[in-house]
């Protein structure tokens, strides 16, 4: 009979440790104020905008500083949330860090010179700058 209670205690201890490990392995959510939601906060709209525009797992309205209700997005802490304000779905992405967008795929025309003048029509070199 005593051996049975030792086995029961050992199984119970293993079970408790396993439950603790499952909770630790679960993803933890990080809260961040929405960058795209404005106006009176509505939970359904906040949730939808956080998921679709900010790639969050969830969104909800909460009162924080000064009693104002704001939309908060919840991200998986193991992944980093988007840094910049995302573009709406279907919009063209912003230019690369260099500042100017890449030329069109079909060739297109070269970008204008940095000094603001227009490029020569024949494709030759531009005239020298004036001295006056």
Curated annotation (Swiss-Prot):
The mature protein extracted from the plant exhibits an average rate of 76% of hydroxyprolines. O-glycosylated. O-linkage of 3 galactoses plus 9-16 or 21-23 arabinose residues attached on one or two hydroxyprolines. Post-translational modifications do not seem to influence T-cell recognition. Thus, recombinant non-glycosylated Art v 1 could be a starting template for engineering hypoallergenic vaccines for weed-pollen therapy. Optimization of codon usage is required for effective genetic immunization against Art v 1 and should be considered in the development of vaccines for the treatment of allergy. Changing residue 77 to S: No effect on IgE reactivity. Keywords: Allergen, Disulfide bond, Glycoprotein, Secreted, Signal. It is found in: Secreted. It comes from the Eukaryota. The keyword Transit peptide does not apply. Residues 1-24 form the signal peptide. Residues 115-124 have a biased composition (Low complexity). Changing residue 30 to S: No effect on IgE reactivity. InterPro entries: Scorpion_toxin-like (IPR003614), Scorpion_toxin-like_sf (IPR036574). Residues 81-132 are annotated as: Disordered. GO terms for biological process: defense response. Disulfide bonds join 30-77, 41-61, 46-71, 50-73. Changing residue 73 to S: Loss of IgE reactivity. Its main location: secreted. GO terms for molecular function: molecular function activator activity. Residues 28-77 are annotated as: Defensin-like domain. GO terms for cellular component: extracellular region. Residues 83-114 have a biased composition (Pro residues). It holds the Pfam family Gamma-thionin. The keyword Glycoprotein applies. Residues 64-70, 79-87 are annotated as: Epitope recognized by IgE antibodies of mugwort pollen-sensitized patients. Contains several extensin-like repeats in the C-terminal section. In the N-terminal section; belongs to the DEFL family. This is Major pollen allergen Art v 1. It comes from Artemisia vulgaris (Mugwort).
């Amino acid at each position: 009979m005593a051996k049975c209670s030792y086995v029961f205690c050992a199984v119970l201890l293993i079970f408790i440790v396993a439950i603790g490990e499952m909770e630790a392995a679960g993803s933890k959510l990080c809260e961040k104020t929405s960058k795209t939601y404005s106006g009176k906060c509505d939970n359904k709209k906040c949730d939808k905008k956080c998921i679709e525009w900010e790639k969050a797992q969830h969104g909800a309205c909460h009162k924080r500083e000064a009693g104002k209700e704001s939309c908060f997005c919840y991200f998986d802490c193991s992944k980093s949330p988007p840094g910049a304000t995302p573009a709406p779905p279907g919009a063209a992405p912003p230019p690369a860090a260099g500042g100017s967008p890449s030329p069109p795929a079909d060739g297109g025309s070269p970008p204008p010179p940095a000094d603001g003048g227009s490029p020569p029509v024949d494709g030759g070199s531009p005239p020298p700058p004036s001295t006056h």
